[in-house]
Amino acid sequence: IYALPTIPEIIKRQAINQKEKNIINNLVKSVSEDLKISNDNNAISFVPPYARYPYEIWVAPFKKVDCIKQLSDEEINSISNQLVSSIKRLDLLFDEPMPYTMAVYFPPRGFEGNFHHYIALQPMRRDKNKLKFLAGIEQISGLMLSDIIPEDAASKLKSITID
């Protein structure tokens, strides 16, 4: 967990986009079946259409809230189940534990009430024996390259059976 004295520019831009365009809420409400991995009445897991990492997964409540504490116990259980299921799918994808970064998004100060809380899992493998490293072009340009299109990643993840 990091606490910063200022809001990083990229996070500020994301918050402004959420406030002005309701981007995450609109995405959660209209994600295509090709990108959806799993959902119940309260929460969804999916590969974002602009995934930056192969097999990246986002987990979000359907209800637009700033943070998880604004959800009911039932909704929190749904988020938890989607998150655990997503991590299990990543671990089963290549038959070994998947290293990943998990980002939990809350509104920065000043953007409360205009944010849609979500969790992003950014897996560090692009194949069984290949880790995802940022290439020079990615570090220089900020554009991310991926070995797999989001729809194919979602299809592979969706096909994994969870016990």
Spans of features found by a protein language model:
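HIT superfamily nucleotide-processing domains
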Residues: 1-163
